[in-house]
């Protein structure tokens, strides 16, 4: 064999020239495909391959002469050009540029067939990298040249019968060999018989799993400096590196969104054009990408080949199994630097970041509402269309989302697959388990900026925020009542009251006072006013209540908690209803009007109480003295005259009161506060009632008349004293002389 005279063979490895020309074999930097694999690639995948190979050619410096970009583009744009002449031309270029002295014979026609995988025996080997690079029969070299712009790989071969046809109705491809048709059919069935033992990923081709295993073994020539993964080809290494650098060189011209791969961009562009080339033969549903189509096919087959070793749950995809396994391992690879919170899924992490920044990139065209994630936006869109695809077979209830439907089904089955490792308590959803976990750790990482209250989850913090903003985004279409939580709206819509309100029907009648009610629940609560049943007891003072809401409200009198604050004057209240009523003092709104006298009220309860002044109804009767009252609150205050209970104590003078209103008036005396001023004389008073009584002295009005003599008085107390003169009653006696006075 003649001595190789190429300069890279002759020069000393230590010279500067040899250091500059660091040899790289083309088979190391090219992606290797078999013919069967190539025929299964779609146009976008072939174009991606073409771009990668172009980049590889441009960067390749192992051959003494650079390959012209212009020529490369020309080869790709002319796929029908003679493959034989193309190979011979490249061989001649290399021969002319090198001086290795090797001879090359003409390559026979059958050696230029794509199925050939070994170099032609007529091509003599050479120890120099230039000769090794020729590799005419090598599939890596062949494939590097035959990238196309949309033409099928087999268009390069114009000869030979193709007896094997694909049986799929929408695929008319034909093949020369039976293995090729079997491989093609896997693309339709989704069959991937080759599974990786390390990560579980599956492949259609045996060659694909061999390439994939290089990443795990670390035997690849090109190792990633970020994660240590190894690759057998330089092009795959470059593409992988983008996952770390975040480089997205392919940008959508319509919306500006960027992508790591050109194939992904092409799939994305279909969302703008509406093109869905992959159609399901069973339900006619169409998809943008082949991967989405294959995933959908499994929904018809019911196939779930990937099973969790911990709980036995099965999944249709390996990615779903991997995500599920994190619920058992507790692994949270995505960490928020701002709050230090770990998240199991990338999509959850991205949504979490947007929630903290306030970014809502998904806008509803109908109502303008913004959303943090595409999934939330898609769910919201269904509220406008009314679409509910998932229907429960047991109760007929329908849902927008499959996840909501699955969660609902567990109510019927009683299934609670998420179990707390500390206390054994089980839950229907992973999110419920995560929130519950905070009860053991005591961790509440989400703090309200308004009041400092902390919560276990961001959703709880968001919902709490509405108590400060007063936001009630969920409104009943029937009665207009608004709610802070969608759950409360759903409960409201299911109530009998809501159903019967339009007709005015009140089928539940009290046998004692004959009052009517829309719902059984309201009726049962009312019955307790007659029976005196109070099952909810305060742990601090022992006071009992008819319903748990009343107990919760009462407990705030002990804690002093007033979470509902007026934005106009800063006054705080124990309940949202009290805040709403108070806000009407600023707006002057009085929506509840008496039909008999036209008097208006700021709250419904005051209208109801007022209505009894017309009817004379007093349904609340004292069991000790038989005295009756128009409202339950008046009865409760009266009962304290029998029990002697005075729960409201002044901290200044320790005087106690049975009524909260009396306690408030008393406190004003200590502060010197007199907010009610007389328009006639300018005098100030501690309460509105005292002002009303005083006003009578100016207008001469005397409401209280003696039935015995007809004398009239401004005040009830004056009439009461006067009445004693008729009865001869003198309750006040002097201790010194014994004289009595009325």
Curated annotation (Swiss-Prot):
Checking Pfam families in the record gives: KRAB (PF01352), zf-C2H2 (PF00096)
Q: What keyword terms does UniProt attach to this protein?
A: DNA-binding, Metal-binding, Nucleus, Repeat, Transcription, Transcription regulation, Zinc, Zinc-finger
Q: Which GO terms describe its molecular function?
A: DNA-binding transcription factor activity, RNA polymerase II-specific; RNA polymerase II transcription regulatory region sequence-specific DNA binding; zinc ion binding
Signal peptide boundaries: none
Per the UniProt entry, what is one GO biological process? Answer: regulation of transcription by RNA polymerase II
Chain spans, region Disordered? 1-20
Q: What residues does the KRAB domain cover?
A: 24-104
PANTHER family this protein is in? RIKEN CDNA 6720489N17 GENE-RELATED, ZNF44 PROTEIN
Family the entry assigns: Belongs to the krueppel C2H2-type zinc-finger protein family.
What is the protein's known function? Answer: May be involved in transcriptional regulation.
* Name this polypeptide is given: Zinc finger protein 700
């Amino acid at each position: 064999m003649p001595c190789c005279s190429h300069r890279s063979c002759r020069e000393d490895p230590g010279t500067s020239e040899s250091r500059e020309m660091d040899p790289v074999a083309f088979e190391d930097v090219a992606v290797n495909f078999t013919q069967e694999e190539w025929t299964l690639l779609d146009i976008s995948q072939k174009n991606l391959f073409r771009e990668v190979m172009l980049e590889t050619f441009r960067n390749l410096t192992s051959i003494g002469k650079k390959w012209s970009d212009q020529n490369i583009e020309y080869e790709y744009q002319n796929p029908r050009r003679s493959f034989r002449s193309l190979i011979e031309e490249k061989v001649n270029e290399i021969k002319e540029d090198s001086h290795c002295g090797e001879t090359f014979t003409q390559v026979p026609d059958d050696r230029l067939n794509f199925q050939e995988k070994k170099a032609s025996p007529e091509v003599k080997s050479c120890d120099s990298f230039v000769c090794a690079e020729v590799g005419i029969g090598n599939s890596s070299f062949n494939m590097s040249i035959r990238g196309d712009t949309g033409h099928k790989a087999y268009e390069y071969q114009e000869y030979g019968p193709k007896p094997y046809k694909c049986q799929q109705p929408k695929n008319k491809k034909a093949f020369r060999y039976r293995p090729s048709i079997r491989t093609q059919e896997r693309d339709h069935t989704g069959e991937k018989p080759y599974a990786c033992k390390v990560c579980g990923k599956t492949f259609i081709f045996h060659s694909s799993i061999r390439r994939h295993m290089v990443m795990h073994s670390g035997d690849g020539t090109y190792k990633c400096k970020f994660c240590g993964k190894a690759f057998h080809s330089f092009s795959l290494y470059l593409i992988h590196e983008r996952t770390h650098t975040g480089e997205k060189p392919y940008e959508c011209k319509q919306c500006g969104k960027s992508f790591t791969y050109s194939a992904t961009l092409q799939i994305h562009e279909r969302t703008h054009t509406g093109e869905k080339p992959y159609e399901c033969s069973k339900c006619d549903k169409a998809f943008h990408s082949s991967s989405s189509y294959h995933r959908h096919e499994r929904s018809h087959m019911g196939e779930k080949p990937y099973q969790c070793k911990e709980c036995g749950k099965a999944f249709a995809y390996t990615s779903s199994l991997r995500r599920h396994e994190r619920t058992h391992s507790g692994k949270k690879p995505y960490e928020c630097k701002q709050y230090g919170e770990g998240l199991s899924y990338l999509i959850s992490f991205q949504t979490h970041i947007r929630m903290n920044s306030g970014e809502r990139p998904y806008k509803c065209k109908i109502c303008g509402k913004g959303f943090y994630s595409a999934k939330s936006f898609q769910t919201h869109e269904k509220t406008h269309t009314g679409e509910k695809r998932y229907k429960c077979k047991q109760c007929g209830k329908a849902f927008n989302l499959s996840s909501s439907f699955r969660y609902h089904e567990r109510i019927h089955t009683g299934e609670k697959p998420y179990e707390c490792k500390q206390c054994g308590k089980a839950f229907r959803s992973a999110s419920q388990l995560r929130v519950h976990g905070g009860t053991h750790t005591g961790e509440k990482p989400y703090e309200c900026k308004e009041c400092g209250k902390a919560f276990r989850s961001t959703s709880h913090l968001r919902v709490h925020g509405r108590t400060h903003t007063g936001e009630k985004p969920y409104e009943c279409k029937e009665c207009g009542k608004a709610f802070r939580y969608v759950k409360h709206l759903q409960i409201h819509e299911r109530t009998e009251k809501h159903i019967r309100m339009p007709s005015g029907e009140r089928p539940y009648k009290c046998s004692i006072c004959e009052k009517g009610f829309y719902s059984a629940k309201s009726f049962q609560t009312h019955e307790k006013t007659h029976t005196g049943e109070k099952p909810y007891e305060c742990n601090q003072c022992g006071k009992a209540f008819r319903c748990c809401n009343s107990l919760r409200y009462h407990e705030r009198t002990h804690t002093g908690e007033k979470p509902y604050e007026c934005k106009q004057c800063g006054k705080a209240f124990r309940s949202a209803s009290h805040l709403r009523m108070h806000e009407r003092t600023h707006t002057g709104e009085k929506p509840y009007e008496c039909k008999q006298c036209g008097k208006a009220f700021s709250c419904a309860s005051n209208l109801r109480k007022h209505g009894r002044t017309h009817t004379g109804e007093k349904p609340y009767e004292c069991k000790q003295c038989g005295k009756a009252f128009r409202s339950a609150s008046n009865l409760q205050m009266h009962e304290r005259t029998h029990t002697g209970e005075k729960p409201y104590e002044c901290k200044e003078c320790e005087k106690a009161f049975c009524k909260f209103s009396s306690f408030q008036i008393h406190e004003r005396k200590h502060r010197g506060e007199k907010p009610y001023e007389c328009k006639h004389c300018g005098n100030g008073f501690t309460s509105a009632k005292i002002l009303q009584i005083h006003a009578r002295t100016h207008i001469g009005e005397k409401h209280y008349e003696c039935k015995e003599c007809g004398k009239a008085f401004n005040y009830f107390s004056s009439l009461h004293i006067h009445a004693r003169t008729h009865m001869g009653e003198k309750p006040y006696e002097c201790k010194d002389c014994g004289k009595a006075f009325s």
